Amino acid sequence: MAGHSKWKNIQRRKNAQDAKRGKLFMKLAKEIYVAAKSGGGDPASNPSLRLVIEKAKAANMPSENIERAIKKATGTQEHTNYEEIRYEGYGPGGVAVMVVCLTDNKNRTAANVRAAFAKNGGNLGETGCVSYLFERKGLLVIDREQHNVDEDELLLLAIEAGAEEMETTDESFEIYTAPESFETVKDELEQQGFTFASAEITMIPQTYTTLEGDDLKKMLKLIDTLEDDDDVQEVYHNLDESVLEE
């Protein structure tokens, strides 16, 4: 994985989402609701809930919003049944796109996702058409300004805790784990005094596609359109966004 900062692409996406904070909080509340409903409202015994709560806190979601979503899921009132659906397709220039949705209306969601692709130079594909281009990984990002630590020392700590590898950029250390090792590595590094700019299980592209001109504009519009949809939780893609820094 060396030579390309996956966190840069993810961070750029998160910054765009932060600009739409109200919508982001709504989506996080839905994710908390689903996790609490399926695994219980105690984060100590529900790893999925614990992880999404940490993600919500990292996004500065108010604690009362988090508690409200948990209480809604574990209370006696009528529950909303959300279903997770994944769509796969191609953006302009053959960029691979995976869209993760939580929806209570599959027909509405399918129509909206299909329209987003069609209007922005892409097309939906069959299940599995691009998923093989991504790998599910735990990603822990440590801000270098916040931690005065030797790179080799941190790498040794991470590997001993169960991490697979670490990448270093000017701004951060990016530690990658297998999904099943994520909590163990995270807990061990926290015990060593580290905090994280981001901690999540995500989909990492194995290769990247570079676009320019109209194709790049259409691809960015496709991402924005999908992320604006209330049913869409995550948009993963293999667009090389480093060109946006130039």
Swiss-Prot record:
The keyword Transcription applies. GO terms for molecular function: DNA binding. GO terms for biological process: regulation of DNA-templated transcription. The keyword Cytoplasm applies. SUPFAM superfamilies: YebC-like (SSF75625). Its main location: cytoplasm. One of its GO terms (cellular component) is cytosol. It holds the Pfam family Transcrip_reg. It is found in: Cytoplasm. Keywords: Cytoplasm, DNA-binding, Transcription, Transcription regulation. Belongs to the TACO1 family. This is Probable transcriptional regulatory protein GK2594. It comes from Geobacillus kaustophilus (strain HTA426).
